[in-house]
Amino acid sequence: SGTTGFPKGVVLTHHNLLNNALAAAKAMKFTRWDKLAVPIPFYHCFGMVVSNLMCFSVGATVVIPGEYFRPEEVLFAIESEKCTAVHGVPTMFVAELEHKDFHNFDLNSLRTGIMAGAPCPPVLLERVMNEMHDREILIGYGQTESSPLAHLTKKDDTFDRRVNSIGTNVPHTEVKIVDPGLGVTMPFGEVGEICFRGYHVMKGYYNNEEATRQAIDENGWLHSGDLGTMDSD
């Protein structure tokens, strides 16, 4: 919402947000002993829910590198605070890896994190895992309308699965692939629109009933507007 059209306010509930944050924490095996570097803006659902609220839900530490994103501040925060995780969009990880002083920072404390917001090229994931020592980093997919996480890879997933898929839907939710024109469910491997249903679906668009009806059908399915395929597993 807002990327390709006029921005719409998304109404999310406490139930939406807290459960989505807990889903992220469980996927990352996060505990009160972990520390997360958060360079993502707090006004974005990724930073607000999947980062801050996720830490609050398990008592983990939120480390704020700076007022806005500077790669050197993120690297310094990870080293100085011994962060066990870092979140970001792919371009943030690229900026960190390409920083002229990257190899002067000790990032061995890193264990996990989430990369989301755009597709992750295989070479980038490989560098994050090997050069940043972030071996358990997860790939996430979603949108503000789904609180925001809808899909997430697992820490034990193979490299191929992490770069060639968006993982499985988060627990206690449903997903299906439908023909955008006919609305029928597509077979495994066939391209269609990704639809979600579950606790994470927004209450609706703020003061916009027409847009809400277009996004959420009578059976509670949120139509993402994105195309994808579903594997048998």
Name the predicted role of every residue range.
Residues 8-11, 38, 61-68, 138:
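Short beta-strand->loop structural element characteristic of the AMP-binding/adenylate-forming
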Residues 60, 80-88, 97-161, 174, ...:
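Gly/Ser/Thr-rich phosphate-binding loop
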Residues 71-75, 94, 102, 213:
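Short hydrophobic/charged patches on amphipathic alpha-helices used for structural packing
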Residues 32-33, 110, 218-219:
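Phosphate-coordination loops involved in phosphoryl transfer and adenosine-cofactor binding
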Residues 2-3, 59, 117, 142, ...:
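Conserved G/P- and acidic residue-centered "switch" motifs that form tight phosphate/ATP-binding loops
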Residues 184-189, 193-233:
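Conserved ATP-binding/catalytic segment of the ANL
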Residues 18-35, 45-85, 99:
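Conserved AMP-binding/adenylation subdomain of ANL enzymes
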Residues 1-19:
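Conserved AMP-binding A3 loop
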